[in-house]
Amino acid sequence: MAGVLALACAAEGAFAACNTPATQVTDAALTTLLSGNTVCAARGGDRWQEEHQAGGALWDYKLGDADPVDPRTQVGTWSVTEAGTASVVTYDYGTGSQSYEIWDDGGSYSFCQAGVVNVDNATVVSGINVGCP
């Protein structure tokens, strides 16, 4: 799927959401934010909803379990490195991994690499197998 975070590497914006006044999500707070929850994001015409299963499995909700054409499926793995301001979430879709800092801008989130926004305005929905609004 073209919308997965690993394929979203072109810079979406400048430095605005990868520094203050946004707050970097670090250490255990990063694991708490993602584990057992769904990240909802969009860029251009692509939209995705990735479920961060406890234990590290990463699922794309797509159109849900009941959809015969585009059901939810595992797309890779995720993990968190808790290291203060060097804390990152790493995604592996089977073709190599990508690591991102996550910045909280008041309830929407930016996924950043080297201070550059790759995905912005992402939201987190509580739970898995719930889809995004």
Residue ranges and their predicted role:
Residues 2-10:
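Bacterial N-terminal signal peptides
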